């Protein structure tokens, strides 16, 4: 499927009916990609169309090729990622590093590898908690620190977080007046969540630098651009059924092998 061509355009180009084009699409298989043993650094992520259909993709940062994918029909799970890892290992691949987002428990599950937390996703997580325009000075300064992740080193970043906590730690940990049951809650939950997320994942934000000879990307931009291109092609094929959409995506990803 070259460029942005609708079913009608494809039928006109090849002088066949739209139904014939659809049948051709249905013949495209959906199977694991054939790979041979090699050293790889994989960028892993999933894209969704609606709440109950998506595809998980592993892309090698060295060769820029897709090395594994899987369709999913509910929210992604750690076991899905481990299935892909197992497939690559069994096919003789040596995984030098993994770039991923902050799915709860995923980094721990992959801890036997060099795991790089996507710096872009980290900043995005902080933005989602603080918004782009926090009202408090604590929020403004923490947001500014998070925006420096891709422009500073680990030691400087940890130093900035420590200084921020020295100034705003008490404010961040303020609790409410006890209710009738004696329970209290944190007054600044989103600020606290943003800080703890940064602190908890600091060790994985500079894996690329700690293992610089492995040439691990610091973000998942390589796989995000693949999803953006795939989406642009799918938008002009809105008439595809779920089955044919899977066939289309399979063909697209196999061409990226």
Indicate residue ranges for each PLM-predicted region.
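RNase H-like nuclease fold core
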Residues: 13, 20-99, 104, 108, ...
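Short, amphipathic alpha-helical "recognition" segments used to contact nucleic acids or chromatin
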Residues: 1-5
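Residues within the helices of the helix-turn-helix
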Residues: 7-12
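Short coil turns linking two alpha-helices in DNA-binding domains
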Residues: 6, 17-20
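Conserved beta-strand -> loop -> alpha-helix junction used to position metal-binding or nucleic-acid-contacting
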Residues: 97-143
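Acidic/histidine-rich catalytic cores and adjacent linkers
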Residues: 93-103, 110, 143-257
